[in-house]
From Swiss-Prot:
GO terms for cellular component: cytoplasm; cytosol; nucleus. Its main location: nucleus. Residues 92-110, 129-196, 205-221, 228-245 have a biased composition (Basic and acidic residues). Expressed in roots, leaves, stems and flowers. It comes from Arabidopsis thaliana (Mouse-ear cress). The gene is RZ1A. The modification N-acetylserine is found at S2. Induction: By cold stress. Residues 7-85 form the RRM domain. This is Glycine-rich RNA-binding protein RZ1A.
């Protein structure tokens, strides 16, 4: 069996049902095949989604690549390319690694009972990654979302404190209004003082002229009383010739 990489092709994107025989039937029309092999998983024995074919001449290999690359085989679009040469004895494992890197290893996309992905290293269950582990979320009591809620709660508290600050500001203005009210009271008391002065009930006491008007005259009689016919003399009346009038 020839291992010459010059005549060896890499076949990727194979269906799970494609077998060695099916691979040979698809490519033997382009030339004599030395080998047709679907690579299997060493643990499960299932197809890994890629394989190799080896021709005995370069012309057949080139024709197969040109004709079959991008064609349909067993319901799958396959890729056909020249296999990489052996380096350091890596052999077919090196080609297999290249197939996995190019997305031809179907084990990654094979359903595993979850949303896809490998096994979680936290709980050991398949179908999710460690960062999406449901056991981790339940242990944290909601995970990162609960901390997010707490952050918004603290934000609400901050705005509540802001409202309190504005409430205190309103109280300050209320106190200012009280100050002006007391000022108005002061002016009111001042007005009362002047009102008392005008109304006769002030600190200056009763009107002197009123006392004189309501008191006795110098002649001993009350003004307006019987016998009080004489005019009371005003304090500033000047004597005229012939006496007071």
């Amino acid at each position: 069996m020839s291992e010459d990489p010059e005549y060896r092709c890499f076949i990727g994107g194979l269906a799970w049902t494609t077998s060695d025989r099916g691979l040979r039937d698809a490519f033997e029309k382009y030339g004599h095949l030395v080998e047709a092999k679907v690579v299997l998983d060493k643990f499960s024995g299932r197809s890994r989604g890629f394989g190799f074919i080896t021709f005995d001449e370069k012309k057949a290999m080139d024709e197969a690549i040109a004709a079959m690359n991008g064609m349909d085989l067993d319901g799958r679009t396959i890729t056909v390319d020249k296999a990489q040469p052996h380096q350091g004895g890596a052999g077919r494992d090196n080609d297999g690694d290249r197939g996995r890197d190019r997305g031809y290893d179907r084990d990654r996309s094979r359903p595993s009972g979850g949303r896809g992905g490998g096994d979680c290293f936290k709980c050991g269950k398949p179908g999710h990654f460690a960062r999406e582990c449901p056991s981790e979320s339940s242990r944290d009591g909601g995970g990162r979302f609960s901390s997010k809620d707490d952050r918004y709660s603290s934000k609400d508290d901050r705005y509540g404190a802001k409202d309190d600050r504005y409430g205190a500001k309103e109280d300050r203005y209320g106190a200012k209004d009280d100050r002006y009210s007391s000022k108005d009271d002061r002016y009111s008391s001042k007005d009362d003082r002047y009102g008392s002065r005008d109304g006769g009930g002030s600190r200056y006491g009763p009107d002197r002229s009123g006392e004189r008007a309501g008191g006795r005259s110098r002649d001993g009689g009350s003004r307006g009383a019987p016998g009080g016919e004489r005019h009371s003399r005003a304090p500033y009346d000047r004597p005229r010739a012939g006496g007071f009038h």
